[in-house]
């Protein structure tokens, strides 16, 4: 399913416990988990406040930072077991967003605004 992307971007093999990105990092790359398992976690005041959000093989993660142009990552992504990922560079994601149909882009941003506001209420 991801063979074409793997040919273009390659893949990385990661050991269990490898940090893919850390909360507050400024990079905007996206990732596809080819196989393995990744846990998302986040901290507040140096205490873990959320854990147990898992990414499974075939899922995309880390793209919201680029999609919604946020300043920093809200989560830390760490492999739970040996895993393989494809990294999609920020510039590729940005180009896809720029080329996206304007109506679909509007819908996506409206959905995000609605989701974000409902979680703060």
Give the label of every model feature segment.
Residues 13-14, 18-81:
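Cyclic nucleotide-binding regulatory domains
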Residues 73, 92-121:
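A small-molecule sensor/coupling module
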Residues 86:
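Conserved active-site beta-strand element of glycosyltransferases/polysaccharide synthases
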